[in-house]
Amino acid sequence: MKKNGGSIVNISSYSAKDPSISFPTSSTIKAGLSAFVKLFADQYSKDGIRMNNILPGFIDSFDVSNEVRSMIPMKREGRVDEIENTVVFLLSNKSSYVTGQNIRLDGGLGFSI
């Protein structure tokens, strides 16, 4: 990758920025990954290597209760294809100037907590 450049996309969680007392270890690890992506980008972007994190909220691949759904400003869980489309974009040359980012895909959950 160092020879030809490339893109790395990590799937993290909204809890990287909005930790949950229910999942303290996971939230801490995800926060560490959020910091790491910035350090990695600083070190390797000059070599054409990009790294970004996706921070999904509640996604339809899991059962989401009506109570949780009501907390999401968009009033629905995300779809797997919405995550997929973002990954495809970040791996493509269309995002060639995007690196070191933590991209929330959470239906606005992050700004409502």
Give the residues covered by each predicted segment.
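Active-site "substrate specificity/gating" loop of NAD(P)-dependent dehydrogenases
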Residues: 19-23, 45, 64
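Short C-terminal tail/terminal secondary-structure segment
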Residues: 18, 88, 99-113
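Alpha-helical segment proximal to the catalytic Tyr-Lys
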Residues: 42-46, 96
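Conserved SDR Rossmann-fold cofactor-binding beta-strand/turn motif
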Residues: 50-60, 91, 104-106
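Residue(s) in the substrate-gating loop at a strand-loop-helix junction
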Residues: 13
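A conserved structural motif in NAD(P)-dependent oxidoreductases
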Residues: 72-83, 94
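Active-site helix of classical SDR
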Residues: 29, 37
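Helix-to-beta-strand junctions that scaffold the AdoMet/dcAdoMet cofactor pocket
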Residues: 1-4, 45
